[in-house]
Amino acid sequence: MEVKIEQVNRKFISNSNYVFRKILNSEDCLGIIKNFIEAILDIKIKEIELNPYLKQKENYLPREENFGIADVRIHTYENEEMNVGIQFIDGIYVQTKMLMYYSQIHLNQLEYGDNREFAKTITINLLDFNYFSSKGCKKTIRIKTNEGDVRLEEIEMISIELPKFRCYDNDDLTEIEQWLQYLKGCDENTLEKIKSQNKYIKKLDTLAEKYWLEEKME
């Protein structure tokens, strides 16, 4: 399969998972994560909390397992409880990385130590290249398994191929269009429109600018 590489928003192209993780893994940024997940999954979140696994383990994981931006537990207004993981994937072993990441986020629940029941897990996988043959930029992958008469939990993974995203009216963007256009990268005029429409993207962009400024100063 031919993999066509295109650049994501340049604020995040250098080790995107690491940069996003440094910026977003704090209580102050939960609103940003919440807004992103609501836009991608088309849900309304009542409660959201960071799961501590990434922060606690990132220095001890092998490089091939040290991926992911955020690992959160959410409660929706429809009384659903689930874990959501978000990661960028590079162009190598894409399907393997998607499955490994899903497994990591789902099994992270063993680390909580607060007697919570296992909940459904969904992962959001961001690709800055074309990988699947489908034309749409967003793809939902579900894997159903059965063991005898017992139906095991459905695996659900979302993939978003940013280069496939197209928007033809930058003056009236939906929330998911705002996020995908921002992550894909856009001209300054479009960026300013997006930031005027979405305060969470505006905050993330400010934090990204601050991050790179501090990196240069160090």
List where the protein language model places each region.
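Elongated, amphipathic alpha-helical interaction scaffolds
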Residues: M1-E218
